[in-house]
Amino acid sequence: RICTAIPLPMCL
């Protein structure tokens, strides 16, 4: 699972 905080917080 890849989580990002920029530009929006989301996990794929």
Swiss-Prot record:
UniProt subcellular location: Secreted
Tissue: Expressed by the skin glands.
One GO term of the biological process aspect: defense response
Keyword Aminoacyl-tRNA synthetase: no
Role, per record: Stimulates insulin release from beta cells at a concentration of 100 nM and release of glucagon-like peptide 1 (GLP-1) from enteroendocrine cells at a concentration of 1 uM in vitro. Reduces secretion of interferon gamma from peritoneal cells in a mouse model. Has no inhibitory activity against Gram-positive bacterium B.megaterium Bm11 or Gram-negative bacterium E.coli ATCC 25922 at concentrations of up to 100uM. Has no hemolytic activity against mouse erythrocytes.
Organism: Hoplobatrachus occipitalis
Protein name per UniProt: Tigerinin-3O
Keyword Secreted: yes
Cysteine-cysteine disulfides: 3-11
A cellular component term, taken from the record's GO annotations: extracellular region
Keywords assigned: Amphibian defense peptide, Disulfide bond, Secreted
